[in-house]
Design a protein with these regions (language model features):
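Conserved functional hotspots at enzyme active or ligand-binding sites that engage polyanionic ligands
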Residues: 1-126
Length: 126
């Protein structure tokens, strides 16, 4: 079995633009790249060529608090105030990873996980 130890849940990476659809030019820190947060489990990350991620944006419309699917991140590894865009969960091939940025703190990761549960209504009873 092939293992892929280079990406973990909570990591922030720059990925190639073509890894994500609908990228907004103003959200890019490096031209042709976009930051993402890895949200898939480490068990999956170590054994799969794909990662589940959410894009990270510093766009003002993501930071105004009007959309509960945008989670403000308080990570020192981010150069400016940014939000995880939970409404754009996607899976990417790890070949799109460009460079490691850092790791978010445990509270931010918990807030992202909670927002994902709410966004997908994982615990809603019909």
């Amino acid at each position: 079995m092939t293992t892929y130890p280079n990406a973990r849940r909570g990591d922030i990476w720059f990925v190639t633009d073509d890894a994500l659809g609908g990228c907004n030019e103003s959200d890019r820190t490096i031209r042709g790249a976009r930051p993402v947060l890895v949200i898939s489990s480490d068990g999956h990350n170590f054994t799969s060529p794909c990662l589940t991620v959410v894009p990270i944006s510093s766009g003002p419309h993501r930071l105004d608090g009007t959309d509960s699917s945008n989670v403000i991140l308080h990570s020192a590894c981010l150069e400016r105030l940014s939000a995880a865009v939970v409404g754009q969960i996607t899976t990417i091939d790890r070949d799109h990873l460009l460079c490691f940025i850092g790791v978010i703190n445990a509270l931010d990761l918990l807030n992202v996980a909670t927002a994902i549960h709410c966004y997908l209504e994982l615990f809603k009873e019909d």
